[in-house]
């Protein structure tokens, strides 16, 4: 069975339409990818040969302006050739608006369809990367295989994704090289959150081997709210390995300290990546988010295997290829905490994106901070790794202990009842 899903968003007078055709074993929560690479080439495949996605943009003479119109789009049946799928419709919002353009049966059908996309687990070997480093190092290497190993239950606080390399369990933060190809400035990116999902995942920087886990607040797993017209995260979201935004350093251009995390990346390509995937990306620019008084860089990147990668070489190219996406990204980062009762986020540079050259200087700087961090005898974060320069060396015994402290991979925990709810933000 082939499913066809479409999400729609409006920005700057454009209707931005994204289409994803998925095999029944592939979804936004369970994409299985195999990536191989050399110094010059890389290919990506999924468990279904029919899997594809293309961004398309078109002007609309009548932009969507109200909830009824939008929900009509979201409840339209789409025949994919072998089955008809109802797309998800909104079921209320923070500010009262609820769709009335579809029947209750239609809304329930579409809600069930959307929920099925959230609940399929990753495979035990969900993502395998062939890159270039036999020996983990602080620079580019030359041949390695990584696979994602799940523990615990997805959507619960015991969920972990460990990364296994040729030496055994490794830290995706410390052991995967920053560069996939240093000469061409191609970086490795660890995917923490696939596009269109809501579960807020991150590398656990205080745990040995920094597995990916679900963020929590007051003992409850965190999910981002859907800010109209978006669904979950609107890009593949993750981080660059071997980087660190030093909280003891005030960034001169922003006037704020680093946020104590690896540097974040939004990958804007045409495919939904799997959680734990390691993508080869080129960086196009960066946005300087000021999050609760801290500098929180958001790098903009494109998978080098993407169909549009050759067209995207700097930040100005993004607007040409994906018109409206940068504006939507600023809007998303500004507003995503508002439904939780927090104020809107702020930005340095008035929310303007900096170009590729600027972004790469930021990356180089955060890489140097990371090199200093792993040499500290008493670091504030966990720096256990297999890189020779690290003071705290990782061992197979330590890895076995870390994994042994987590439960076996089990059934998914229930999703929150409001995970599909749309929230509307004014102003």
Curated annotation (Swiss-Prot):
What Pfam families has UniProt attached to this entry? Pyrophosphatase (PF00719)
Which reaction does this chain catalyze?
diphosphate + H2O = 2 phosphate + H(+)
An example of a Gene Ontology BP annotation on this entry? phosphate-containing compound metabolic process
Q: From what superkingdom does this record's organism come?
A: Eukaryota
UniProt keywords, alphabetically: Cytoplasm, Hydrolase, Magnesium, Metal-binding
Ranges annotated as biased composition (Polar residues): 53-63, 77-114
Q: What is its EC number?
A: 3.6.1.1
> What is the protein name given in its UniProt record?
Inorganic pyrophosphatase 1
Name its species.
Answer: Caenorhabditis elegans
């Amino acid at each position: 069975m082939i499913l066809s899903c479409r999400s729609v968003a409006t920005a700057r007078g454009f209707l931005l339409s994204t289409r994803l055709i998925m095999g029944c074993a592939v979804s936004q929560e369970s994409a299985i990818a195999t990536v191989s690479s050399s110094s010059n080439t890389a290919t990506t495949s999924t468990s279904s040969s029919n899997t594809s996605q293309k961004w398309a943009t078109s002007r609309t003479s009548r932009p969507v302006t109200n909830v009824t119109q939008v929900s009509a789009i979201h409840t339209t049946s789409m025949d994919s050739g072998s089955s008809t799928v109802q797309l998800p419709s909104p079921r209320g919002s923070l500010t009262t608006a609820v769709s009335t353009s579809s029947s209750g049966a239609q809304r329930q059908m579409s809600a069930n369809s959307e929920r099925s996309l959230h609940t399929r687990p990753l495979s035990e070997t969900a993502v395998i990367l062939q890159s270039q480093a036999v020996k983990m190092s602080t620079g580019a290497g030359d041949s390695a295989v990584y696979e994602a190993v799940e523990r615990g239950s997805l959507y619960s606080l015991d969920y972990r994704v460990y990364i296994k390399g040729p030496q055994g369990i490794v830290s995706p933060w410390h052991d995967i090289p920053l560069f996939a190809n240093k000469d061409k400035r191609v970086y490795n990116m660890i995917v923490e959150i696939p596009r269109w999902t809501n579960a807020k995942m991150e590398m656990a920087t205080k745990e040995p081997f920094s597995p990916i886990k679900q963020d929590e607040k007051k003992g409850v797993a965190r999910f981002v709210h859907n800010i109209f017209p978006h669904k979950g995260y609107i890009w593949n979201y993750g981080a660059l390995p071997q980087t660190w935004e030093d909280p003891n350093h005030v960034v001169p251009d922003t006037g704020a300290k680093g946020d104590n995390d690896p540097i974040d990346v939004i990958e804007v390509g045409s495919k939904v990546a799997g959680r734990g995937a390691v993508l080869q990306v080129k960086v196009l620019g960066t946005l300087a988010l000021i999050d609760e008084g801290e500098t929180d860089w958001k790098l903009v990147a494109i998978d080098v295997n993407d169909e549009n990668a050759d067209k995207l070489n700097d930040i100005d190219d993004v607007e040409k290829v994906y018109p409206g996406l940068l504006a939507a990204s600023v809007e998303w980062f500004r507003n995503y905490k508002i439904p939780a009762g927090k104020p809107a986020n702020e930005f340095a540079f008035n929310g303007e994106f900096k170009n590729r050259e600027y972004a790469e200087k930021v990356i180089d700087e955060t890489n140097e901070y990371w090199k200093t961090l792993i040499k500290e005898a008493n670091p504030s974060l966990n720096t256990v790794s297999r890189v020779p320069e690290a003071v705290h060396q990782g061992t197979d015994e330590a890895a076995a202990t870390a994994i042994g402290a987590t439960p076996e991979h089990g059934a998914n925990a229930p999703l929150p009842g409001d995970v599909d709810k749309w929230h509307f933000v004014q102003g």
